[in-house]
Amino acid sequence: ATEQPAELQPQLPDDLFNAYIASQMALAGDSYEDAQAALEQLAADGSGELQTLAQAAADAEDIEGIRAAFISLSDEVAEASLPEGYSLAFCPMANNYQGANWVQEGDAINNPYFGSAMLTCGSIIKQ
């Protein structure tokens, strides 16, 4: 028997989703301060696991720490239905070559795990 795909959770509220996307864009742009501010907003407005993961990322002492914590946060966000125009992307080199997902706007890769060093590394896996 084949496994049925898990039911997607409803879309995140706009304020939470927008704060996540702001943090993803800030990481892709190599901005620790902007990423931290967006994650603080996500932690303040969120609840449960999303709040815990966002706060852990916001509390990181440097951009590498935020990027490491962003992996689990992105997995949590990816469990929800995505608004139209957003995609789930994957970089095979992130997370010490174990790979990592993230949600982003559009289908032009904007890698939050490597920023300008490898901004376009990855592929869209779901739109």
Stretch-by-stretch model annotation:
Residues 1-127:
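Intrinsically disordered, low-complexity terminal tails/loops enriched in metal-binding residues
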